Amino acid sequence: MFMDFKTLQVTDEGPILRVQLNRPETGNSVDGQMLSELLAVLRALEDDSTVRVMVLSGAGDHFCQGGDRAEFPALLERDPSGSELRSLAEKAQRVCSTLSQLRLVTIARLHGDVIGAGLGLAVFCDLRVGADTSRFRMPEVGLGVPPAWGGVLPRLAEEAGQAWVRRLLLTAEAFDAARAEQLSILHEVVPAGDLDAAVARWAKPIIRRDPTTVRITKSMLNARAGATQLAVASHFDDELLTAAVARRALHRR
């Protein structure tokens, strides 16, 4: 079903599909190729009724340490108009939108650093379990760019609450797994060695549920959470991101 990928490790276990971010040498930083490969997997899942649960994880020491920062200035240098960077931002939004709207249940298995784009990918999953040693951060404002990746801001505010998200974004402070659970960014915190067992406790009953009921329930939850507004909110994200990175590139000259 799935081709060989350069940035993902995909394991088909019948009703469960495991998708592992596989750039451990970069902390699984998200680049354009990873986005393209994620989008290919997600679109294939839209047409596959046999998979009931997708588990998203990261190889190595971290789930994901954010977007590939080296890619942004490289794209601007190659295309000063910013069109390639806008295309990258639009691709990130498509990945997150498709992830949130899949008919099957998605589970994020989190460990190590869950930063920036990594946190964005995680919050678009239905269920999230994290190791008690995992660390979270939204560093964008501290880096001089808006929190534009993937249209994450509305989703994060809906999941964790507007007041806390305001604090975490403006201060760019790191927070631990206990705080992430308090904010409902994590549904459960377990020792790192128990992550697979925790995922299995969720996945096993889910794959026995009626798939139509699961699909309708997810649609109802997404509508309640304002998921239909993500496209509207993220309409501005690529423009903001391009402008911010362009300003940073100009200031460095």
Tell where the protein language model's regions lie, with residue ranges.
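Glycine- (often His-adjacent) and acidic-residue-rich active-site loop
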Residues: 58-95, 142-144, 228
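Conserved CoA-thioester-binding segment of acyl-CoA-metabolizing enzymes
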Residues: 1-59
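Well-ordered beta-strand positions
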Residues: 127, 167, 171-173, 179, ...
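C-terminal alpha-helix plus adjacent terminal tail
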Residues: 1-17, 172-178, 193, 197, ...
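A short, small-residue-rich loop immediately preceding and capping a beta-strand
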Residues: 104-113
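CoA-thioester-processing core
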Residues: 95, 99, 115-169, 198, ...
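Short acidic-hydrophobic, aromatic-tinged amphipathic segments that line or gate anion-handling sites
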Residues: 129-130, 188-195
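Hydrophobic/aromatic residues within transmembrane alpha-helices
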Residues: 19, 56, 68, 121-123, ...
